[in-house]
Amino acid sequence: MVNSCCGSVCSDQGCGLENCCRPSYCQTTCCRTTCCRPSCCVSSCCRPQCCQTTCCRTTCCHPSCCVSSCCRPQCCQSVCCQPTCCRPQCCQTTCCRTTCCRPSCCRPQCCQSVCCQPTCCCPSYCVSSCCRPQCCQTTCCRTTCCRPSCCVSRCYRPHCGQSLCC
């Protein structure tokens, strides 16, 4: 009875049974909410309705499985970038963290003391909150970035020659 209901010819009625949850039976027609078990987490079974904490694995990180309930660190891929998925490849406005300080993630709202690195000192990201000594470069030395903490020799330019930067 199990083979007839869980085989390659899965019927819609018998596919949701608990005794039918096997990796070999995880097909598109057999992947249901009642069949989302860890043993059923294979790439061919990754569907939105199966995105649960027990089924969110590295082999189940597909674009169709990118829902908020399935966004776990092991599923952090470029196709699954959510606020709870802060990784370098997931650099978004809600993902400004120390582990996300990459050139592709340099946003004005990401200019924080923890994310202000030489790789993040671009002209368009020269905001006052990002003025740090390690960001004092020729491309980041502007009038809005002339702070005492940014007064180093390599950053001293004519347009930074103000009283606070002398």
UniProtKB/Swiss-Prot annotation:
<feature type="repeat" description="15">
    <location>
        <begin position="90"/>
        <end position="94"/>
    </location>
</feature>
<feature type="repeat" description="17">
    <location>
        <begin position="100"/>
        <end position="104"/>
    </location>
</feature>
<feature type="repeat" description="25">
    <location>
        <begin position="145"/>
        <end position="149"/>
    </location>
</feature>
<feature type="repeat" description="8">
    <location>
        <begin position="55"/>
        <end position="59"/>
    </location>
</feature>
<feature type="repeat" description="9">
    <location>
        <begin position="60"/>
        <end position="64"/>
    </location>
</feature>
<feature type="repeat" description="11">
    <location>
        <begin position="70"/>
        <end position="74"/>
    </location>
</feature>
<feature type="repeat" description="18">
    <location>
        <begin position="105"/>
        <end position="109"/>
    </location>
</feature>
<feature type="repeat" description="21">
    <location>
        <begin position="120"/>
        <end position="124"/>
    </location>
</feature>
<dbReference type="GO" id="GO:0005829">
    <property type="term" value="C:cytosol"/>
</dbReference>
<feature type="repeat" description="4">
    <location>
        <begin position="35"/>
        <end position="39"/>
    </location>
</feature>
<dbReference type="Pfam" id="PF13885">
    <property type="entry name" value="Keratin_B2_2"/>
</dbReference>
<feature type="repeat" description="2">
    <location>
        <begin position="20"/>
        <end position="24"/>
    </location>
</feature>
<feature type="repeat" description="1">
    <location>
        <begin position="5"/>
        <end position="9"/>
    </location>
</feature>
<feature type="repeat" description="22">
    <location>
        <begin position="130"/>
        <end position="134"/>
    </location>
</feature>
<feature type="repeat" description="12">
    <location>
        <begin position="75"/>
        <end position="79"/>
    </location>
</feature>
<feature type="region of interest" description="26 X 5 AA repeats of C-C-[GRQVCH]-[SPT]-[VSTQR]">
    <location>
        <begin position="5"/>
        <end position="154"/>
    </location>
</feature>
<feature type="repeat" description="19">
    <location>
        <begin position="110"/>
        <end position="114"/>
    </location>
</feature>
<feature type="repeat" description="20">
    <location>
        <begin position="115"/>
        <end position="119"/>
    </location>
</feature>
<feature type="repeat" description="3">
    <location>
        <begin position="30"/>
        <end position="34"/>
    </location>
</feature>
<dbReference type="GO" id="GO:0045095">
    <property type="term" value="C:keratin filament"/>
</dbReference>
<dbReference type="InterPro" id="IPR002494">
    <property type="entry name" value="KAP"/>
</dbReference>
<feature type="repeat" description="16">
    <location>
        <begin position="95"/>
        <end position="99"/>
    </location>
</feature>
<feature type="repeat" description="13">
    <location>
        <begin position="80"/>
        <end position="84"/>
    </location>
</feature>
<feature type="repeat" description="7">
    <location>
        <begin position="50"/>
        <end position="54"/>
    </location>
</feature>
<feature type="repeat" description="23">
    <location>
        <begin position="135"/>
        <end position="139"/>
    </location>
</feature>
<feature type="repeat" description="26">
    <location>
        <begin position="150"/>
        <end position="154"/>
    </location>
</feature>
<comment type="function">
    <text>In the hair cortex, hair keratin intermediate filaments are embedded in an interfilamentous matrix, consisting of hair keratin-associated proteins (KRTAP), which are essential for the formation of a rigid and resistant hair shaft through their extensive disulfide bond cross-linking with abundant cysteine residues of hair keratins. The matrix proteins include the high-sulfur and high-glycine-tyrosine keratins.</text>
</comment>
<keyword id="KW-0416">Keratin</keyword>
<feature type="repeat" description="24">
    <location>
        <begin position="140"/>
        <end position="144"/>
    </location>
</feature>
<feature type="repeat" description="14">
    <location>
        <begin position="85"/>
        <end position="89"/>
    </location>
</feature>
<protein>
    <recommendedName>
        <fullName>Keratin-associated protein 4-4</fullName>
    </recommendedName>
</protein>
<feature type="repeat" description="5">
    <location>
        <begin position="40"/>
        <end position="44"/>
    </location>
</feature>
<comment type="similarity">
    <text>Belongs to the KRTAP type 4 family.</text>
</comment>
<comment type="subunit">
    <text>Interacts with hair keratins.</text>
</comment>
<keyword id="KW-0677">Repeat</keyword>
<feature type="repeat" description="10">
    <location>
        <begin position="65"/>
        <end position="69"/>
    </location>
</feature>
<feature type="repeat" description="6">
    <location>
        <begin position="45"/>
        <end position="49"/>
    </location>
</feature>
